[in-house]
Amino acid sequence: MIAVVFAQQGPVIPNFGRGDECIRNNGRFCLHWFLDNFGDRFWPRVVEHIELTAIALAIGFVISFAAALIAYRYTRFELPFANLSALFYTVPSIAFFQIMVPITGIGWTSIEIALVSYTLLILFRNTLTGLQEVPDEAKEAAEGMGLTRAQSLVRVELPLAVPAIIAGVRVATVTTISLATIAAFITPLGLGAPIFSAIQTGANTAFVAASLLAIALALIADVVIVVVQRALTPWVRARSRAA
């Protein structure tokens, strides 16, 4: 009896809402679907992307900072490290990731080695340049105050080099965020995973959403670094106001 009633009324089509209708039509960007699926589909990828970027930047900064200090003290060390890091930087990203797979396997290790390698040249150059551009007057004043070479480095030279160092961190951060997206070509991690998946399936919303999230992540990171820079270098603002 119930079957007869439903047959007379015609087929029953569930109401999926505007988001699902947009997805069925493969709209360019379905906002409702994105908001409904952000927590499950995209937020874990955002966290992975942040982790990939943060780990690479932390390791790259430690290596580059130490190398810059050595090169600042022993100038003959500058050229070999600069050439090595420049060699890493010139390797195409996808090729670098593929080269690492037979060596360290598919996963975080291969991606992090490649990402760290791309940060070295930028961070090393900016740190060393910042130290080399410290005015001689500042060094002489520190020496006149009785500071040792190590004390002068920590209290005078490094603080004056902070703007150049952070400028390098800004560039390295944005670069790493973009390269971490390409890393999903090797293994599905970060925001590159939904991007490459959407390319294969033709899912417009997933592609646009993941791309916009990667762009937003880079912009937010850049703003945060600028705020940190201003907090660490108040004398730069005071100097610009005086000028």
Predicted regions and their residues:
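Short cytoplasmic-facing helical segments at TM-TM junctions of multi-pass membrane proteins
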Residues: 126-165, 171, 195
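C-terminal transmembrane helix and the adjacent membrane-cytosol boundary/short C-terminal tail
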Residues: 75, 132, 209-243
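Alpha-helical membrane-interface segments at transmembrane helix boundaries
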Residues: 39-51, 82-88, 101, 105, ...
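Loop-to-helix entry region at the N-terminal start of transmembrane alpha-helices
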Residues: 41-52, 101-122, 206, 210
